[in-house]
Amino acid sequence: MGSIAILGVPGAESGGGTLKVYNWGEYIDEDVITQFEDETGISVVYDVFETNEEMYPVVEAGGVKYDVVCPSDYMIQRMIDNNMLAELDYDNIPNAKQIGDDYWNMSKDFDPKNQYAVPYCWGTVGILYNKQMLEQLGVPKPTSWANLWDPKLSDEILMQNSIRDAFMIALKQKGYSLNTSNPEELAEARDMLIQQKPLVQAYVIDQVRDKMINGEAAEGVIYSGEMLYIQEQIEELGLDYDLEYVVPEEGTTLWIDCWVVPKNAENKEAAEKWINFLCRPDIAKKNFDYITYSTPNTGAYELSDEELQNNEALFPDMDSPAMKNSEILRYLGDDTDNIYNEMWKEVKAQ
């Protein structure tokens, strides 16, 4: 668990009590927390986590009773299934109307009646490629995940060190659902990942961005929200190559992180004020500028400049074939999780 930061204003507690927030690291502009405290008189206790898997048992155990938490799609589904979340009162969250219909519909995949979760950030997984390096290697611009099996890319590929992301790539290439629990389809995907392994320079997470900026690889699997930072760095450093992002035609993982209120929250009223505050367009825009992951907030989108609005990595055409073929990650249950884990070990052991 991340260290607790109590960001309060003197005497604030008497105004509205304390709000315990559990969020991803680097996933909010800290000025927003201060502004919330100043405007509401509520004192914020703010903890951070690194993965959904780290967050879940902490909330489940209830040692710290968090009032508001920001999990991802599949983990929200798991929390709903296990009766861990409180239904939201949207009368207290009028700014929820700023969230676009596309994102409410995406959320229905794991929260069918939109009762428990308010979208915060979203994005895709795709291929980041160095245009000039691909030309030198004689590799075409990627339009399919199959590109990551091109023998000319030996030692030039950075893969995500993430079980579901890695399997998604192999499964989608074969035309299977990224949420399959079919052992035969999973075995096929495992074998493909083993076959690809000699081409892979490294399995990494956060390092894809910096390695690609440094020209250390020709292609990398990356999250769409990294593109704004990458484009700024290319300009700032005056690099003489282009890094471009594409979602392959077979589709990809659509992910969405949302705010939820655990059932054992001690200050649900403050939690709903927090969610409402973060849905305010000026605040959502401030967070978007800081986090750089796509915002589902239509008001914040309208406040953004035209260049950002037209950035296809951040705001893709939802009617394109690639996006229509994309899926939200689902929680598949412990048994299927174990199959994925065992098969991933087999890939890494080769």
Labelled PLM ranges:
Residues Y56-P57, Q77-W122, L137-A146:
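Hinge/lid segment of periplasmic solute-binding proteins
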Residues P262-M323:
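Mature extracytoplasmic/periplasmic domains
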Residues L128-M133, K172-G175, W255-N267, K286-N287:
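A bilobed periplasmic-binding-protein/Venus flytrap-type ligand-binding module shared by bacterial periplasmic
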Residues A86-K97, A117, L237-T253, P262-A265:
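Short beta-strand->loop
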Residues A146-N161:
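Short loop->beta-strand "edge-of-pocket" segments that line small-molecule binding or catalytic clefts
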Residues I6, G11-M79:
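Early extracytoplasmic/lumenal segment of secretory-pathway proteins
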Residues L158-S162, A166, A170, S177-V246:
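Ligand-binding pocket segment of bilobal, Venus flytrap-like solute-binding proteins
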Residues D210, S320-Q350:
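Conserved C-terminal helix/tail region of periplasmic/extracytoplasmic solute-binding proteins
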